[in-house]
Amino acid sequence: MYARSTTFEGMPANVEAGIAFVRNEAAPMLAKAEGCRGLSLLVDRATGQCIATSSWDTEAAMRAGDRELRPLRDRGRDILGGSLEMDEWEVAVMHRTSHGECCRVSWLQGDVEAMTETFRVGILPELEQTPGFCSASLLVNRATGLGCGTTVWESRAAMEASRVVADDLRRRTADEAAGEIVEVHEYELAYAHLHLPEMA
């Protein structure tokens, strides 16, 4: 399984219009794309930063759909009123127990194999014991050594309450991967229809 994420640095006042665009235009178009499993949208209403992620059965399917979907990304950028950056990933881990409202995204640089094993064997069991936890995923780019870990929580209160635990788990993952934490950001999960299978 593969994923493409597009990070929009938009205007806070345009976030609601961006959500409507994803729900009413982007999602229906992606539903017709061969090999596409779905779409999610994370938003930070305070900064205007939004991340749209599409999931794909194969790398070939993801690449094949790129030309057709490029105008869609450009339209999303215009609606949100900012810039965009695109990343492509392999889905290394996916585990879901229930749906949630908010998520925390952590970007780490390091040994991708060690990062994946630590996330699967050491991190997931502890997350499952944390109140309010709903799901977790790890996307990796083997060429760059970058990993993107996302945890989903049932509410903003649950996400905030998990920060101390999350900080410890994140540091442990970075240490095991002989790497570093690049960035951490919390978002509202505005649209969640990725339809990825269990990969834990």
Enumerate the predicted regions with their spans:
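Short S/T/G/P-rich N-terminal loop/turn motif that feeds into the first structured element of a domain
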Residues: 1-51, 57-200
